């Protein structure tokens, strides 16, 4: 009995659902789908093929804007396409353009252009030929190109060590450099000397654990502290004098 009751309920539910779908196919929004084939907006689809906006599609093939498509092939703006290719266009024909253009023909352009021919351009351009440009650019010949690398900042093959030594002596005294910075090669010595002048931070030493030395710079920089208003380190003689005066006071 229970199984039969359940089956009856399922069949009734399925029948109700199928009835709803069938009802939707016949009427939706109070208008059937089949009805749309014959009329839509009080005008049928079949009627659209014969008339649209009081003018049929077939009528457009013969006349459009009071002028047919076929008529446009023969005349357009009171001048035919065939007429454009033959005699005049702006009072000058296309064929005439090959012989003269601005009182100078295209063929004439190969021999003269601005009173100078194209062939002449290979030998002279701005009173200097292209071939001449390879030998002179800024009044410098090809044999001097190799010497350009010196002026462009490239290191020469044989550097002048005497000038480098003189520059080192002017930048920083050799006594202020550490042992590992005293190199034999003058070029490396010059680079190592410049890091003090550029303000590069030195390596922190092991005996300075407070971290104050880490913010100090090279000795050449620390000597400038008095000029920048920073308090300089007290002299040893001044410290001894202070101790002696304090000892006398205690005595």
Swiss-Prot record:
Subcellular locations according to the entry: Secreted
GO biological process terms, semicolon-separated: neuropeptide signaling pathway
Principal place of residence: secreted
Modified residues (Tryptophan amide): 89, 152, 198, 228
Tissue specificity remark: Prothoracicostatic peptide 5: Expressed in antennal lobe (AL), corpora cardiaca (CC), corpora allata (CA) and gnathal ganglion (GNG) (at protein level). Expression in AL detected in all animals, in CC, CA and GNG in most (at protein level). Prothoracicostatic peptide 6: Expressed in antennal lobe (AL), corpora cardiaca (CC), corpora allata (CA) and gnathal ganglion (GNG) (at protein level). Expression in AL detected in all animals, expression in GNG in most animals, in CA and CC detected in some animals (at protein level).
Residue numbers covered by the propeptide annotation in the UniProt entry: 1-77, 93-138, 156-187
One term under GO cellular component: extracellular region
Region (Disordered): 1-22, 227-251
UniProt-recorded name of the protein: Prothoracicostatic peptides
Species this chain originates from: Agrotis ipsilon
